[in-house]
Structure formats: C-alpha cells, structure tokens
Amino acid sequence: MKRTYQPRNRKRRNKHGFRQRMSTKNGRRVLASRRAKGRHSLSVSSAMGTAGQ
C-alpha cells in the first residue's frame, strides 16, 4: 500500500513557503509568532536557503 506522504519540494514551497505566508493576514501572523518565539527558520522556503528563491 502506498503511503500518504509523497514529498515534493516545489509543492512544499508553494503551500508553506515564505511568500505564501506573506500573502494572507493569518500567514503574516504565523511569521510574527515564529519571529517572537525565535525560531531558526520562519518558513519552509527560508529554511531551504537559496534553493527556495
């Protein structure tokens, strides 16, 4: 049986990336709370470095 999680980097960036977060009010709230908490990576694309840009 095939498992449900079949990872794709492009899909991951597009759904959970920095620009996607910035595009909605709640997404910006997510980024703000992660900044406040001091997270090392704010979003998937920012964690991927230059590959996500």
Curated annotation (Swiss-Prot):
Key words of the record: Ribonucleoprotein, Ribosomal protein
Q: Which InterPro entries match?
A: Ribosomal_bL34, Ribosomal_bL34_CS
- The lineage's top-level taxon is Bacteria
Instruction: List all Basic residues biased stretches.
Output: 1-19, 26-40
Q: Which Pfam family is one of those matched by this entry?
A: Ribosomal_L34
Query: Annotated region Disordered: where?
Result: 1-53
Asked if the record carries the keyword Ribonucleoprotein, the reply is: yes
Q: Name one GO cellular component term.
A: ribonucleoprotein complex
Biological process (GO) annotations? Answer: translation
GO terms (molecular function) for this protein are: structural constituent of ribosome
Q: Where is the composition biased (Polar residues)?
A: 42-53
Q: Which NCBIfam families match?
A: rpmH_bact
Give the similarity note.
Belongs to the bacterial ribosomal protein bL34 family.
Name of this chain's protein: Large ribosomal subunit protein bL34
What taxonomic lineage is listed for the species of origin?
Bacteria, Pseudomonadati, Chlorobiota, Chlorobiia, Chlorobiales
